[in-house]
């Protein structure tokens, strides 16, 4: 192990491992897991609504699918994007008239783990989060909100995970999803937005800003909640997420 430094000048380590490529990578994976506290979780069989309904998932569609998905032997049924009012307004939309707690209960009563899609580190311009609390998002040098990407027909902004109001926002979203509604599996999407370049409340490494956000999620959700990262930074997620979508 050699001493090294990151781009910001902070100390780091280089690891030199001799041997065939596959053996080296296997050992490197073990070393990373041990260093960062990697989580060892049994693989899950998950049915995700996205690939059948995209944003068209609804309470009625869910009720049709639940018995079929259970019969096929899936352990988890995860509701994907489309359930919410808007990205940044994390309440049940019109298509889930009975609410998300009722949806989680129906999935659980069918013998499966209820899962939910959320994008905790981004919000759309028209959302209440952006309108009411613009200070909790990453900014540009000119003081405007930094664009993290484009989807849903327009740009979206990235949460500043170093800012105390953003901490409150994330904790409320995760606590509601897990402890009030009863979802014990979360698909966390677009989470690389936490690491975009820009001006933050505290100027820390972008990787640390990302891990700060994930720590908020993990600490609030608890160790028993399965966290899947989508659009995730793979190595910085070790020790905080249970799995990462790579396809």
Predicted segments, located by residue:
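Carbohydrate-recognition beta-sandwich/jelly-roll modules
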Residues: 1-72, 76
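Aromatic- and carboxylate-enriched substrate-binding clefts and catalytic-loop regions
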Residues: 73-247
């Amino acid at each position: 192990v050699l001493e090294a430094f990151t781009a910001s000048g902070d100390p780091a380590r280089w690891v030199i491992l001799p041997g065939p490529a596959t053996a080296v990578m296997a050992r490197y994976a073990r070393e990373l897991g041990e260093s960062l506290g990697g989580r060892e979780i049994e693989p899950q069989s998950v049915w995700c609504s996205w690939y059948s309904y995209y944003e068209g998932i609804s309470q009625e569609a869910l009720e049709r699918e639940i018995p079929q998905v259970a019969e096929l032997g899936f352990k988890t049924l995860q509701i994907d994007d489309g359930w919410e009012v808007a990205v940044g307004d994390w309440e049940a939309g019109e298509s889930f008239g009975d609410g998300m707690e009722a949806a989680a209960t129906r999935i659980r009563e069918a013998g499966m783990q209820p899962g939910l899609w959320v994008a905790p580190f981004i919000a759309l311009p028209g959302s209440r989060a952006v309108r009411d609390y613009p200070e909790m998002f990453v900014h540009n040098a000119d003081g405007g909100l930094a664009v993290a990407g484009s989807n849903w027909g327009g740009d979206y902004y990235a949460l500043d995970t170093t800012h105390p109001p953003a901490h409150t926002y994330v904790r409320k979203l995760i606590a509601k999803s897990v402890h009030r509604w009863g979802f014990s599996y979360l698909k966390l999407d677009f989470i690389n937005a936490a690491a975009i370049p820009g001006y933050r409340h505290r100027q820390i490494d972008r990787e640390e800003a990302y891990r700060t956000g994930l720590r908020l999620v993990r600490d609030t959700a608890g160790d028993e909640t399965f966290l899947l990262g989508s659009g995730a930074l793979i190595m910085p997620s070790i020790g905080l997420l249970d799995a990462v979508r790579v396809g």
